[in-house]
Regions:
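Glycine-rich FAD pyrophosphate-binding loop
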Residues: 4-6, 15-38
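C-terminal helical "tail/cap" subdomain of flavin- and related membrane-associated enzymes
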Residues: 300-389
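Conserved N-terminal glycine-rich FAD pyrophosphate-binding loop of Rossmann-like flavoproteins
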Residues: 30-54
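A conserved beta-strand/loop capping segment in the N-terminal third of enzymes
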Residues: 45-97
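FAD/FMN-dependent oxidoreductases across multiple families
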Residues: 215-301, 307-309
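Short loop/edge segments at beta-strand edges and connector loops
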Residues: 93-94, 109-111, 249-251
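N-terminal Rossmann-fold NAD(P) dinucleotide-binding loop
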Residues: 10-11
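Predominantly flavin-linked oxidoreductase catalytic cores and closely associated redox partners
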Residues: 6, 16, 20, 99-244
Length: 389
């Protein structure tokens, strides 16, 4: 079994299959899995427990939500008990790879997948080492867990693209305390046009500050679509009194997903996993939990099925059932909210939506933003979700 991509999806699948005695080779183009750790990495507490993640991959816990904007408005929801964690993304990847090794799997880094061909009984995958030397791997199955780049699957049509930049900051303990134990989002066209910003606490004295924007072409909005993210992040630093912070790391990344997830999940013995089959959610940019969930669904099918077409049908059906009807609705809300968020009229529309949340509990906000339980809004939200307001 060849798994291309040692992110949360590929690493978790490798861990599960190696634990069942499967001969697994997990490869990644990165020479070091602690590098390029772009992920806001917030996760609800129940998911941490479900995946059996250890304390070593948890950077901090949170129990509150803070939404700042549009403008200077600020809303806060707090729980007496922890609601979730912020993961150390690099530590998570390293731990999953070590789990794979511990169960007898192999992990090889610095290998980029170039293509594959069908051979008797399986596939021959062509890879290239960082020094340019070619490598060929023969396997019964190949899983493309290479993320939004879809190294082997290739791109489906109608992808919605989100671009993000994140800085890891070193701040004074007093500054860190202001953001501790809460997830903060910055909303509105004066904060991040056609997107949003965030401040997440890491270990004491460290914060993640980031911005993300959707850039699907929109008629009459090219100036917003092409605006670089760097100035927005600098603006956040200044407005949040963080411009004196030390910058420990700078990284960026893409989310590219189809809202309806109606895309090929594989070809023959090549199967897509995680972000490669649009499991990254466009509303809040969440990808880790959904990527790992897709691995949990695929692993038993790879153990049970021998027929590629039947496996792929079952896999796609189970993924669709797992995400449910709320998933495409969350994508529509993301496109409706972020792409339109470029003027005061859009800010006012968002303000009305947020006002409806003020009587909610912190757990209700988690249910909305992590589980997409839009029905808690009631009928008053439907016109907004459907684009009538």
């Amino acid at each position: 079994m060849l798994i291309v991509g040692a992110g949360p999806a590929g690493g978790h699948l490798a861990r599960l299959l190696a634990g069942r005695g499967v001969d697994v080779l997990l490869v990644d183009q990165l020479p070091d899995l602690s590098r390029a750790a772009f992920s806001s990495a917030a996760m609800p507490l129940e998911a941490v427990e479900s995946f059996g993640l250890p304390a070593e991959v948890v950077a901090s816990r949170w129990r509150s939500w803070q939404l700042i904007g549009p403008g200077q408005s600020s809303r806060h929801w707090s729980s007496a008990l922890p609601l979730g964690v912020v993961l150390d993304f690099g530590a998570l990847r390293l731990w999953l790879a070590e789990q794979c090794r511990g169960w007898g799997g192999r992990v090889e880094l610095g290998l980029r997948a170039l293509g594959y061909e069908e051979v008797s009984g399986g596939l021959l995958t062509h890879l290239r080492q960082s020094d340019g030397r070619p490598v060929a791997v023969r396997s019964s199955w190949v899983v493309d867990a290479s993320g939004q780049g879809r190294a082997l699957l290739g791109d489906p049509p109608d992808l919605v693209v989100g671009r993000g930049v994140e800085w890891l900051l070193q701040v004074k303990p007093s500054q860190w305390q202001r953001w501790a134990e809460q997830l903060t989002f910055l909303l509105g066209s004066d904060w991040v046009p056609q997107g949003y910003g965030w401040v997440f606490p890491m270990q004491c004295g460290r914060l993640k500050l980031g911005v993300c924007r959707l850039d699907q072409p929109v008629r009459g909005a090219s100036s917003f679509r092409q605006r670089p993210l760097g100035p927005d992040l600098q603006t956040l630093l200044h407005r949040l009194d963080l411009d004196g912070a030390g910058v420990l790391d700078r990284h960026g990344g893409l989310i590219r997903s189809r809202i309806d997830r109606c895309e090929p999940h594989g070809r023959g013995r090549l199967i897509g996993l995680g972000d490669a089959v649009s499991t990254a959610n466009l509303l809040g940019g969440e990808g880790i939990r959904h990527a790992m969930a897709s691995a949990g669904l695929l692993a038993p099918l790879l153990l049970q099925e021998r027929d590629p077409d039947r496996l792929r049908r079952r896999y796609q059906r189970q993924l669709s059932k797992h995400f449910g009807w709320r998933w495409p609705l969350s994508g529509r809300l993301a496109r409706r909210t972020w792409l339109a968020l470029r003027d005061r009229r859009a800010d006012h529309r968002l303000e009305r939506l947020l006002a409806g949340l003020e009587t909610c509990q912190a757990a209700d906000l988690s249910a909305l933003l992590f589980d997409y339980r839009f029905e808690r809004y009631g009928l008053r939200a439907l016109p907004y979700l459907l684009g009538w307001r």
